[in-house]
């Protein structure tokens, strides 16, 4: 591609960003291939499923894992298609909360956008901590495999998770210019590792399970009835198919965001669905004794399956190390995505100390303060594991719930705005769906996401005790309470969210003057301290 073409496309994207009253502050370096690699490294369903494989083993077994995954992927594809057209129309780092601001009826758009932003950040920051922990589990699991006398303690897990988080911090701070190249490398590594792992397991395992075990044998050790156990088992699939909004938060660093970001969203879901299904099938056919697998001393059932298949500790460590590299690269991507989201929300005055968090380091063109805050929250959430295993298991549910609630609020705003205010009847971005299809996918997606968000609050074992209780509902209630409290105390006077100039003019909604956020003293927020352009 000619340099002039890249420059022209970047200028077009800068103009589109300016139409939402933002100025371009990042360097645009991500191409479509780079963003597919970046997004797939975060979605990377097959490695994500390996991290929560034990849930499926205990709640329903292979049939629930396989068919649950297929069902979740079908619904997720509909959601991704609908989400992609919003990303194409409004390619801005705020992602979900920005789209809600554009789609919801004007009377409630700011409030709904603000709440969406809180849930979005909750999901992103918690997911970063969860991924750090997964990386720690794989590293310590390999140590236990090689040295069976080594007993994994909770504090080991926390310290190694911190190491993963700090490594991600170092890459994001000292090598931000290499992120797009790293994404390309991770894409190739991901695909090659997937092929090697699948091929090795199928070739070395000589005691494969029969089709009856994989597709028909229902297993339930949760203490719940079959129906409840099935719902709990599907949670594995919900977690595995998540974070596909990643390209939307990196759009301000893409050379042709409005065209390529939607493609990256759709392609990452497609690749994740196929790789996840093939990986699950392989694991289920190659699984040995199900109780021994679930109770492996490594703490990672997948590592036990690798060892049972290869009968080689070195071979198992090679396969597990391939996945570990992908998980660490995912941590790097989640930190980049999370920090851009913090920056975007702060730019719209949605957070305390917004002026500080929305600053961009002029030399490296990165939101340095937002990066530091993001990693600090991740490490703080990892520290919960010092105290209780149940507490960190709740963080896993919070991470996925935060994403799913923010997704559902997007479609709620879409339908509410269309049917009650006749907004956004169609999108004029490079990628758009026919109106009936768009509305249909939005309605189906909303129902599916609400179902998923509710089920994340269920405990995973019965009888329910203080230790086994799922505290996700309490945590989500706290997030909701904090968002409402900060809204009524400070944000109601400061937060405005993004504004589409063309949309405002066409619909006669407000003006540049009336929509400006204000500081606590009532003065208008200026371009210099939040990166927004007001005339």
Language-model segment annotations:
Residues 26, 149-156, 184, 188-311, ...:
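Helix-loop-helix junctions that connect adjacent transmembrane segments
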Residues 98-109, 144-145, 220, 264, ...:
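TM-loop-TM module centered on a large, flexible mid-protein loop between adjacent transmembrane helices
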Residues 77-154, 158-165, 169, 327, ...:
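Hydrophobic transmembrane alpha-helices that form the core helical bundles
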Residues 1-62, 76-77, 81, 494-535:
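Membrane-interface "cap" regions at the ends of multi-pass membrane proteins
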Residues 69, 113, 143-176, 194-197, ...:
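Transmembrane alpha-helical segments of multi-pass small-molecule transport proteins
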Residues 92, 116-135, 236, 241-253, ...:
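Membrane-helix boundary/coupling elements in multi-pass transport proteins
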Residues 156, 355-366, 407-474:
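C-terminal membrane-solvent junction of multi-pass transporters and transport-like membrane proteins
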Residues 156-214, 242, 265-269, 396-409, ...:
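Membrane-interface loop-to-helix entry segments
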């Amino acid at each position: 591609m000619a340099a002039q073409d890249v420059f022209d496309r970047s200028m077009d994207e800068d103009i589109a960003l300016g139409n939402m009253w933002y100025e371009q502050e990042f360097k645009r370096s991500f191409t479509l291939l780079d963003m597919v690699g970046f997004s797939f490294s975060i979605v990377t369903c097959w490695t994500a499923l390996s991290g929560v494989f034990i849930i499926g083993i205990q709640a329903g077994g292979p049939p629930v894992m396989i068919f649950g995954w297929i069902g979740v992927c079908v619904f997720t594809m509909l959601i991704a298609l609908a989400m992609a057209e919003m990303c194409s129309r409004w390619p801005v780092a705020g992602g979900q909360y920005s789209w809600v601001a554009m789609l919801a009826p004007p009377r409630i758009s700011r409030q709904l956008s603000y709440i969406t932003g809180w849930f979005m950040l909750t999901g992103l920051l918690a997911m970063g901590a969860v991924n750090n922990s997964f990386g720690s589990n794989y590293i310590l699991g390999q140590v236990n495999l090689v040295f069976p006398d080594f007993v994994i303690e909770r504090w080991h897990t926390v310290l190694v998770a911190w190491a993963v988080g700090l490594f991600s911090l170092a890459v994001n701070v000292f090598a931000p210019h290499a992120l797009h190249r790293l994404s390309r490398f991770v894409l190739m590594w991901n695909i090659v590792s997937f092929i090697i792992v699948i091929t090795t397991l199928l070739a070395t395992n000589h005691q494969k399970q029969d089709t009856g075990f994989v597709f028909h044998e229902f297993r339930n050790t949760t203490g719940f009835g079959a129906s409840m156990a099935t719902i709990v088992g599907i949670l594995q699939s919900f977690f595995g198919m998540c974070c596909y909004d990643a390209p939307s938060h990196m759009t301000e660093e893409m050379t042709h965001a409005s065209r390529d970001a939607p493609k990256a969203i759709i392609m990452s879901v497609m690749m994740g669905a196929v790789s996840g299904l093939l990986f699950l099938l392989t694991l289920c056919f190659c699984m040995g004794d199900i109780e021994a697998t679930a109770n492996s001393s490594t703490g990672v059932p997948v590592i036990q399956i690798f060892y049972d298949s290869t009968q080689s500790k070195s071979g198992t460590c090679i396969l597990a190390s391939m996945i570990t590299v992908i998980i660490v690269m995912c941590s790097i991507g989640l930190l980049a995505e999370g920090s851009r989201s913090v920056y975007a929300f702060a730019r719209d005055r949605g957070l305390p100390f917004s002026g500080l968090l929305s600053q961009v380091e002029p030399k490296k063109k990165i939101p340095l303060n937002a990066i530091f805050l993001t990693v600090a929250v991740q490490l703080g959430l990892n520290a919960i594991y010092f105290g209780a295993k149940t507490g960190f298991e709740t963080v896993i549910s919070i991470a996925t719930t935060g994403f799913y609630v923010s997704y559902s609020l997007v479609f709620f705003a879409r339908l509410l705005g269309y049917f009650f205010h006749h907004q956004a009847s169609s999108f004029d971005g490079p990628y758009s769906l026919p109106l009936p299809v768009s509305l249909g996918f939005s309605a189906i997606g909303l129902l599916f996401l609400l179902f998923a968000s509710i089920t994340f609050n269920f405990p995973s074992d019965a009888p329910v005790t203080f230790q086994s209780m799922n505290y996700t509902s309490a945590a989500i209630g706290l997030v909701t309470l904090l968002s409402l409290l900060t809204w009524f105390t400070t944000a109601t006077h400061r937060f405005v969210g993004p504004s589409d100039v063309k949309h405002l003019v066409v619909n006669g909604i407000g003006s540049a003057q009336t929509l400006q956020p204000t500081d606590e003293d009532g003065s208008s927020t200026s371009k210099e301290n939040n990166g927004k352009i007001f005339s």
